[in-house]
């Protein structure tokens, strides 16, 4: 009988091979249990190692965000449909913080706050993902605002100019044209986009928070008709969405925009509106049993907006020189800008445009209140030509508003006050502008020059806008060199000013008012003395011209 010749080494290697190829069928993961759920909030027991702002996975693939880390439970905000979440269901950790996909493929698309497309045009191929909670650029990483961002709205570009990297608040009651101002600004970037120059191009992100679905659809339609969807992304969290989506939407929009900013590009983001985001965050906080403060808002509602708006910046040249310009919208009640959320956002932003209901109802649109509106940064980014012609515009309009109130009670006014009232009425008429019709900056300069230079003083108020429109049509057709000079040099030299005055005076001769009268001012002629009447010749003593020093 043959002996077995198995060595100890063979046995050892066989055992090692078997142990090395062994895989366990068990895995270790933290699992929690839903204690109660409702109104978009769930309390989960277990999950001792969960992080704040971590994503949790509920049954059916529904996601939630861990916000409250209590001693025995976790308070989570459910993102999406929460109707099927019930007590006793299991909840898993994902080990990830909330992030969204970003990239150029998002241009022209409509997405939800999770970065998922909702426009029915298929999936979006993302370049990378970006966390929603990111630190804003530090002081060292920024530079001062020095490039203009033209809105195409005369009243804003002349009196409250906006620079690239600035945060300009648009504030006013409902139905005063806040969204229209921002949509006009997006439409006005089309000319820059068509140049193909990355230094001029401005990508746009429109964040709709708590808006009606029809409103979001009409904004999208206006952008498509204006050719602006090519460079715009819409982040939509309509009124029908949960409070969690409304809270997250502005952060999603800023994450998409920051990707381009850190890539050296220029971006404009519109938050429409942050009042509804604050209300959604208040609802979440109250449901999570956080202690309420003023107007029942939680104590960190200021931080909610400050950490969002501080992401708007003009980056230093070392970081590529990109910029993110923010236009947050705040809705007031009865023109009260001293309420909690309005004062918070006013203190965070670099200026505000205040839209007033009374002006809107009077037909002054955009209904910007000059006295309360201000830009604390943009003046440094205003082009020189606009600075020259619009220097006295704000003062003239403010004086007009004061005199207008006084004139209602005064029976007779002196000649100076009457002239100020007449000039002011024409300036107000000049600054009116139809919706979705932004104006190039060179045409704005000519338009403002008409008013502040006194060229409209002889034109009846009701004919001011027709005079402006027909003059600009004439200049586009016959004097294109004037527009190109202002556009290229961004200055209004003495030669350009003289040529412009000459064109205006020549145009006036052929322009007739609505009553058929000429708008050329009559030359002032002094009456003759009685003893000179009937004489063949009259000697007139003229003062000797003074010598120039």
Swiss-Prot record:
Its main location: membrane. ATP binds at residues 172-179. InterPro entries: ATP_synth_asu-like_sf, ATP_synth_asu_C, ATP_synth_asu_C_sf, ATP_synth_F1_a_nt-bd_dom, ATP_synth_F1_asu, ATPase_a/bsu_AS, ATPase_F1/V1/A1_a/bsu_N, ATPase_F1/V1/A1_a/bsu_N_sf. Coiled coil: none annotated. GO terms for cellular component: plasma membrane; proton-transporting ATP synthase complex. It is found in: Cell membrane. It is a peripheral membrane protein. The record marks 373 as: Required for activity. F-type ATPases have 2 components, CF(1) - the catalytic core - and CF(0) - the membrane proton channel. CF(1) has five subunits: alpha(3), beta(3), gamma(1), delta(1), epsilon(1). CF(0) has three main subunits: a(1), b(2) and c(9-12). The alpha and beta chains form an alternating ring which encloses part of the gamma chain. CF(1) is attached to CF(0) by a central stalk formed by the gamma and epsilon chains, while a peripheral stalk is formed by the delta and b chains. HAMAP family: ATP_synth_alpha_bact (MF_01346). This is ATP synthase subunit alpha.
